[in-house]
Amino acid sequence: MKVDVLVAEIGSTTTVVNAFKDLDSENPVFWAQGQAPTSVLEGDVRIGLQGAIDDLCRKMNIDSLEYDEMLATSSAAGGLKMTVHGLVYDMTAKAAREAALGAGGIIHDITVGRLRRSDLARIKEINPNLILIAGGVDYGERDTAIYNAEMIRNMGLHTPVVYAGNIENQDEMKLIFDEESGQELYLVDNVYPKIDTLNVEPCRKVIQEAFEDNITKAPGMEHVRDMVNGPIIPTPGAVMECTKLLYDCIGDCMVIDVGGATTDVHAVTEDSDAVARILTAPEPKAKRTVEGDLGVYV
């Protein structure tokens, strides 16, 4: 049997595949689904992926499955663990947090101001997949983000860094996170370029690029990447993109994603005049919250 697209979701507890047919017709079909336990502990996520495909074949009473394209998302091996470091919580740190959550990140720590020894100890303990540094409006305060970058660089980590702060600091960041640092640097537009202005979408896209570049930490994922068409993005980020598409069709909407390990709530809405009058800080059009350890594992 051959389908147009097979979509794989390699979750923290369960791997699910969904098969779609007739996508170029007026009546596209969601044809079948299969699932199996995610196999990180077995040392290769492809075991769980093949198990999910085998489950689909059993349900549809077919011997094998072929497909023109394969797409994939992942939250295996803990998903996209991030730490976020800004200048003021209600401004740059909050903007960076919204960008990270919207991209599908799981934020394990947020700091404001200059990093202290206890902050550095937490970062080392968390061992994040990605570090996001922000701070300062464009052409405003510079020193805090530079100080924090230097402290993180001196930790000797090999964790990629996204810088989304004052654009005047970008050349400094290149000097701090040079080749000798062993840390890949991603530069992006400021998430908080001026007072009461959020600019989170460019940062979200770069975070997802960084995730895809470094997804091979889940055993076997490097082989899955060779199988798929296009990037592998964090599962929560994929749900956010779907929520945005749903918004284009029906308007303001909320999506609740009950996973095996976490429950995510996504919302896409334009502020009403009544809400705008009582807001004390800007909110992004698309936003996500996440509650860890509140999933439903079946």
What does each model-identified segment do?
Residues M1-V7, L23-P28, Q33-D252:
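Nucleotide/phosphate-binding catalytic cleft detector across ATP-hydrolyzing
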Residues L6-V16, S75, D257-T263:
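Asp-based phosphoryl-transfer active-site loop
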Residues V16, E141-R142, E172, D264-H266, ...:
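Short helix/loop capping segments that flank catalytic or ligand/cofactor-binding pockets
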Residues A19-L23, G86, A267-T269:
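Residue-level signal for short segments within beta-strands and strand-turn junctions
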Residues N27-P28, G34-T38, K244, C249-V298:
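Glycine-rich phosphate-binding loop of actin/hexokinase-like ATP-binding domains
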